[in-house]
Amino acid sequence: MNNNPRKKRAENMAYRSMKDTTLLRIFVLPVIILLIVMNVFPLFWSLVLSFSDYSAKKTTNWGVNPEMIGTENYSQILSDPKMWNRFITTAKFVLLSVGLQMILGFGIALLLHQVKFFGKGFLTTLLILPMTMSPVIVGIMWKLFYNPNYGMFNMLLGLGKIDWTTDPNFNLFGVVIADVWMWTPFVMLLSIAGLSAVPQYLYEAAEIDRASWWYKFSRITMPMVYPLLLVALIFRTMEAFKIFDVVMGITGRGTTAPQLLSMYLYNVGFVTWQTSYGSALGYIMLIMIIAITSIFIKYLNRAKQ
């Protein structure tokens, strides 16, 4: 019988390590299963459906393999002139909404960072509140603001009875205003984080050299904050392409809603139940988002270097 204490200690450590590994696998396994069931499988199945003729509403399709039709859904989407109008409308929304969020968010962050005054922390907290609200609630709230009869928006601006929710000339701008109001604080927070991380000695050295405010802004502030601004731009661009709940709260799903891709995808997939067509449109949107964000990520990697 071997009573070597070192060998016993090594055996105990090996057993304990094996036990910890087993426990780790037991705890991680349910998460992996849920990830596969809730994400990977729907992603794969929707890709299969995009190459088929299938409607989830037809009870005759239940348990039946979908009829494969190749790239017909994709060809139909890309050859539809109305679909290109929706692409253009979505691009307008993204450019307007994200552009205003970046400008306003960074501008407010600059003011809060440079100007010292009593109650700045309280004001910052108030400015953050919109992004903590549910998007559907934000949409309904702005729908009440936009009401042409009793809404406060037209009353405060003295614009008369403009219907920002149903008028096709204004409903897109109505959604832009609500989205900018809600998500400008997100850009502001990231900008404040970037501005706070700029070393103070750089500004002190610039002061000694009697550098102008523009030199300090363009050569010190912007290069240091630029990576975080790109992060904000990436996240907001992705979310703007997929916007749905704010639009639903403001305009509903009817014909009065702005002709955005996300709203059309909802109507196709869950109102008319053209499941395969909706899946193909969803993957086209996914490719667009990946392509655009890849460009931003490329610039982000350059900025880090």
PLM features per residue range, with description:
Residues 16-305:
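A structural signal for multi-pass alpha-helical bundles of membrane permease subunits
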Residues 1-19:
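Short, Lys/Arg-rich, polar N-terminal cytosolic tail immediately upstream
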